[in-house]
From Swiss-Prot:
Residues 188-801 are cytoplasmic. It comes from Pseudomonas syringae pv. syringae (strain B728a). The keyword Secreted does not apply. Belongs to the FtsK/SpoIIIE/SftA family. This is DNA translocase FtsK. Coiled coil: none annotated. SMART domains: Ftsk_gamma (SM00843). Essential cell division protein that coordinates cell division and chromosome segregation. The N-terminus is involved in assembly of the cell-division machinery. The C-terminus functions as a DNA motor that moves dsDNA in an ATP-dependent manner towards the dif recombination site, which is located within the replication terminus region. Translocation stops specifically at Xer-dif sites, where FtsK interacts with the Xer recombinase, allowing activation of chromosome unlinking by recombination. FtsK orienting polar sequences (KOPS) guide the direction of DNA translocation. The chain crosses the membrane at residues 24-44, 73-93, 117-137, 167-187. The lineage of its organism: Bacteria, Pseudomonadati, Pseudomonadota, Gammaproteobacteria, Pseudomonadales. Consists of an N-terminal domain, which is sufficient for the localization to the septal ring and is required for cell division, followed by a linker domain, and a C-terminal domain, which forms the translocation motor involved in chromosome segregation. The C-terminal domain can be further subdivided into alpha, beta and gamma subdomains. The alpha and beta subdomains multimerise to produce a hexameric ring, contain the nucleotide binding motif and form the DNA pump. Gene3D superfamilies: 3.30.980.40, P-loop containing nucleotide triphosphate hydrolases (3.40.50.300), Winged helix-like DNA-binding domain superfamily/Winged helix DNA-binding domain (1.10.10.10). It is a multi-pass membrane protein.
């Protein structure tokens, strides 16, 4: 395998720390200077000694900043006039800018500094001139209202442009200088002002609407009470009852009026549902994205040993809120009404809008069972005129029940949007998976090494293949071929074949199921080899093994392979190197189970049971989640599941052991059940187009070529190795094999009827050795397999002289 060249060296840590300390020092210096100048200006006294005049009482200084402060204030007032008060505020603005960008490295630019200095000069000159033109002279200052600068510039401008023209000129120069010096965007100021105005308008409008609605309801109630009174009077008057009956009727009317009044009071005091705020600004990009933006040449430079930039993916669209708090509250009120029509009394507690669905958390009344609400899911979907409604019976840490209703306008979650988050960038695992966003729009990042295997299921069109592509690309954007290796099995010959040629592949993309069985068998053998290596090294997992190998290499004493068997004295054991994490991806698991059958299930079960510490992980995907495909043996060893949209509740229970997947929306909408929990998380999967996949594959092809291991698929390439469907038996006679007699001789001499022993002795594949042992069993040379998996040799050994 080709060794990758090291990545470009990063900025030294001491230089980064120096940049941060310089910024902190500049912040402290700016802040102290601002406070000192403001204190000197506010406590200025003309009797203090100064630059523009002398003082008879030089020994006593009234200025709080001392003699130096008195001189500074006198100079600033002499030159700038009233504008001297603005000068410390400008320094405070620069201190605030240094504080905002304190986590970014220090970057000196002479051109940018000169540009900021020009803006400051324009700002000071224009401000002083405006102060001279529009303010009167004060006896307490050493100069005019605009100082020496303002007086000179103001008089010149008034002679040429008059007061109005001079004012317009200096206002324009003042705004220009303010923009250049503070990097202020007036368009952004207008946007913020407009947003605040609209928010205030919506607030007042909502309050007015609530007051008007309450007033109308009160009028309606009063009218109903009057109508009831009239009907009672019409009924009671002709009969002329006695005084006791009249008193009882009046008491009933008073009680009814009091009940209605109490109902109206409770309705007015009803706390409205809390609407969770949507993210007003996009997620802060990660350090990797900022680094790629600062180095645009990095996009086109395909250097071996580097990772492709995230910028080759399609950028995310700008998120626009397609709802208002009033519309969400209206749907919540409608939900309460519909549930009340079905005899379930609830109140909406909070509303959580998201990119695809909105979750309404409701508080059931006392005595209402959650099962009653769950059984009304289809009726609610019909009543609310939506495609489906999902009921979340248990929300951890809350007493509410979740009702998830799809949004009218669904937002697309771009894959680049998830990869650009700090959560993905800070993940250390080489098999980090970026799945998408949760219902609140937050990224969902998980680690395949902790799962340690994943079962994915969903019908056609549910987004299953796109989800598998997103998982593979997550690994390709996180790890190089020295950290992660892939074995891809693609029975459909369409989905995973586009990854052919990337350097992460251990073997070509497997499309023949005979090769798939051999690839899984090689994975089991590699798992056993790694466990033996780790046992010899005294470590418990792959990360500990790699750490020990790295420490030995750094110390200049690389470790030799302890499992190497020397054939001669002169042979030297090869040196140990870092072992990559291996991910086996099967796109259509059901098709492989139909063709290969029981043997593959046993191999998958062995990998799922033991391969976590060895760094071998499985991703099994199928569009037919039936019990004959996802068997109990596989489900018991793969606790992490991912269910896309399925056709029935039975299929949902087959995948995640509970319903809910049949109510998903498709197109990437999934239920992800992390390991160690039985509560699934609803995730909106990230969308990856075919063009993006091709761009990533081409980027990796430019960075290196694959180094295939021929031993992975060699088992089916042995001469005379037929393959017959799911049984795995050869179609030709095993006794006609050229090595059959030699195999019988070895078994009789060693008295060991083991497939692995014959395989090692004759250096042949597993299938061929198994057929020879089965032929010996049929010929009566060995017995059938015992309960412990061993065989006994029946035929006598060769006669020795």
């Amino acid at each position: 395998m080709k060794k990758s060249t090291p990545a470009p060296s990063a900025v030294p840590l001491w230089r980064q720390q120096l940049h941060y300390r310089l910024k902190e020092g500049a912040l402290i210096a700016f802040g102290a200077l601002c406070l000192y100048l403001m204190m000197a200006l506010l406590t200025y006294d003309q009797s203090d000694p100064g630059w523009s005049h002398t003082s008879s009482n030089a020994a006593q200084v009234q200025n709080a900043a001392g003699r130096a402060g008195a001189f500074c204030a006198d100079i600033l007032f002499m030159i700038l006039g009233y504008f001297a008060y603005i000068f410390p505020l400008l320094l405070a603005i620069k201190a605030w800018q240094v504080f905002r960008h304190r986590h970014e490295p220090w970057q000196w630019s002479g051109w940018l500094f000169s540009w900021r200095l020009i803006g400051l000069v324009f700002l000071i000159l224009a401000g002083a001139a405006l102060a001279h033109i529009h303010f009167h002279f004060s006896a307490g200052f050493p100069g005019s209202a605009g100082g020496v600068l303002g007086e000179v510039l103001g008089d010149l401008a008034k002679k040429a442009l008059n007061i109005q023209g001079s004012t317009l000129l200096f206002i324009a120069l003042f705004l220009f200088g303010l923009t250049v010096f503070t990097d202020l965007s007036w368009f952004k100021v207008m946007d913020v002002t407009g947003k605040i105005t609209l928010d205030l308008f919506e607030l007042f409008q909502g309050a007015a609407n609530r007051w008007w609605t309450a007033r109308a309801e009160r009028k309606q109630m009063v009218a109903q009470l009057r109508e009831v009174d009239m009907r009672v009077n019409d009924v009671v008057a002709p009969v002329a009852p006695d005084r006791r009956e009249q008193a009882k009727a009046r008491e009933r009317l008073v009680e009814r009026e009091a009940s209605l009044s109490k109902h109206m009071t409770e309705r007015e005091k009803h706390v409205p549902a809390v609407i969770a705020p949507a993210p007003s600004k996009p997620v802060e990009p990660s350090k990797r994205v900022m680094k790629e933006k600062q180095a645009p040449l990095f996009v086109d430079s395909a250097v071996e040993g580097t990772l492709p930039p995230i910028s080759i993916l399609d950028p995310a669209e700008k998120k626009q809120l397609n709802y208002s708090p009033e519309s969400l509250a209206a749907v919540g009120h409608l939900l309460e009404i519909k549930l009340k029509e079905f005899g379930v009394e609830v109140s909406v507690d909070s509303i959580h809008p998201g990119p695809v669905i909105t979750r309404y958390e409701i508080q059931p009344a006392a005595g209402v069972k959650v099962s009653r609400i769950s059984n009304l899911a289809k009726d609610l979907a019909r009543s609310l005129a939506v495609t489906s409604v999902r009921v979340v019976e248990v929300i951890p840490g809350k007493t509410t029940v979740g009702i998830e209703i799809p949004n009218e306008d669904r937002q697309i979650v771009r894959f680049s949007e998830v990869l650009s988050t700090p959560e993905y960038d800070n993940a250390k695992s080489p098999v980090t998976l970026a799945l998408g966003h949760d219902i609140g729009g937050k990224p969902v990042i998980t680690d395949l090494a902790k799962m340690p295997h994943l079962l994915v299921a969903g019908t056609t069109g549910s987004g299953k293949s796109v989800g598998v592509n997103a998982m593979i690309l997550s690994i390709l954007f996180k790890s190089g071929p020295e950290d992660a290796k892939l074995i891809m099995i693609d029975p459909k010959m369409l989905e995973l074949s586009i990854y052919e040629g990337i350097p992460h592949l251990l073997c070509p993309v497997v499309t023949d199921m005979k090769d798939a069985a051999n690839a899984l068998r090689w994975s089991v053998a590699e798992m056993e080899r790694r466990y033996k290596l780790m046992a010899k090294m005294g470590v418990r997992n792959l990360s500990g093994f790699n750490q020990k190998v790295k420490e030995a290499q750094d110390a200049g004493e690389p470790l030799a392979d302890p499992l190497y068997k020397r054939e001669s004295i002169h042979d030297e054991a090869p040196l140990l190197s870092k072992l990559p994490t291996i991910v086996v991806v099967v796109d259509e698991f059901a098709d492989m189970m139909m063709i290969v059958g029981k043997k593959v299930e046993e191999l998958i079960a062995r990998i799922a049971q033991k391969a976590r510490a060895a760094g071998i992980h499985l991703i099994l995907a199928t569009q037919r989640p039936s019990v004959d495909v996802i068997t109990g043996l596989i489900k018991a060893n793969i606790p992490t599941r991912m269910a896309f949209q399925v056709s029935s509740k039975i299929d949902s229970r087959t995948i995640i052991d509970q319903g809910g997947a049949e109510q998903l929306l498709g197109h990437g909408d999934m239920l992800y059940m992390p390991p160690g929990t039985s509560l699934p998380i609803r995730v909106h999967g990230a969308f990856v187009s075919d063009e993006e996949v091709h761009r990533v594959v081409e980027a990796w092809k430019l960075r290196g070529s694959p180094d295939y291991n021929d031993d992975i698929l060699a088992g089916v390439e042995e001469p005379g190795s037929g393959f017959d469907g799911g049984s795995g038996e050869g179609s030709e006679d095993s006794e006609s094999d050229a090595l059959y007699d030699e195999a019988v001789k070895f078994v009789l001499e060693s008295r060991r009827a083991s497939i692995s022993a014959v395989q090692r002795k004759l250096k042949i594949g597993y299938n061929r050795a198994a057929r020879m042992i089965e032929a010996m069993e049929m010929a009566g040379v060995v017995t059938s397999m015992n309960t412990n998996g061993s065989r006994e040799v029946l035929a006598p050994g060769p006669v020795r002289d």
